């Protein structure tokens, strides 16, 4: 009995099993604090999909402090090449290795006009609006057009296959490089593409300087961020070509 009691006093309690990590690619309704919790386990980043971006923009002004913190968190994630430390009483501390998430959603044209005017009239714009790289602004159509078609099952199947490949393929097998063993892989422009990019970037720079001379500071900021937009679109199109089977691996895989 003495030996048994001694064993019970010194034996360690079994460790609780580690909670499995859920792969997340999309989020909808989440605070910036919860987005941070999700990002710490999402090395590939996530996409915040908003049915109405107007609600997101309005939330920044609902409570001064909370809105300011959320706006700052959104702004900081734009580059997509950094990390982020969170230290909060009650929430503890954690580390986000890949501090990146994109915003995508719909907004009424009238709200776009309002947001643009606010950015233009603000003397200390923080560049939030300019970080929305693409806007689709519909033309007003008075005529009625009925659209009632069955979905194309072949296209839907191909879309699923391409999406799965994008989530699972190894970019290094298709020519992507790494600076360090733990760094994210990257692609380089071909010589022809690099020449075309430099010509475009030179013209972009001229337009940016013209906007600065005319004191069109919001427009200037938007033009300056087009460098990232073109690189991002090039990468997206290239990876879609890979996922569609139009680009083969750089070497044979056994």
Language-model-detected regions and their locations in the chain:
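Conserved ASCE/P-loop NTPase catalytic core
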Residues: 1-103, 107-115
């Amino acid at each position: 009995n003495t030996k048994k009691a001694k064993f019970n006093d010194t034996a360690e309690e079994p460790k609780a099993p580690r909670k499995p990590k859920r792969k997340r690619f999309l989020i909808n309704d989440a605070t910036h604090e919860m987005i941070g919790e999700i990002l710490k386990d999402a090395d590939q980043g996530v996409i915040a999909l908003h049915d109405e971006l107007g609600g997101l923009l309005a939330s920044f002004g609902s409570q001064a402090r909370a809105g300011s913190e959320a706006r700052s968190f959104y702004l900081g994630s734009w580059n997509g090449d950094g990390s982020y430390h969170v230290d909060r009483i009650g929430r503890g501390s954690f580390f986000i290795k890949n501090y990146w998430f994109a915003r995508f959603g719909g907004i009424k044209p009238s709200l776009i006009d309002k947001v643009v005017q606010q950015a233009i009239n603000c003397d200390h714009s923080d560049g939030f609006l300019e970080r929305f790289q693409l806007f689709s602004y519909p033309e007003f159509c008075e005529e009625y057009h009925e659209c009632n078609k069955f979905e194309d099952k072949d296209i839907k199947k191909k879309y699923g296959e391409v999406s799965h490949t994008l989530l699972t393929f190894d970019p290094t097998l298709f020519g992507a490089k790494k600076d360090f063993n733990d760094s994210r892989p990257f692609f380089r422009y071909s010589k022809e593409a690099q020449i075309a990019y430099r010509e475009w970037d030179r013209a972009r720079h001229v337009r940016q300087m013209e906007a600065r001379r005319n004191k069109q500071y919001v427009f200037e900021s938007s033009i300056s961020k087009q460098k990232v937009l073109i690189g991002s679109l090039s990468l997206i199109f290239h990876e879609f070509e890979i996922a569609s089977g139009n680009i083969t691996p750089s070497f044979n895989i056994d």
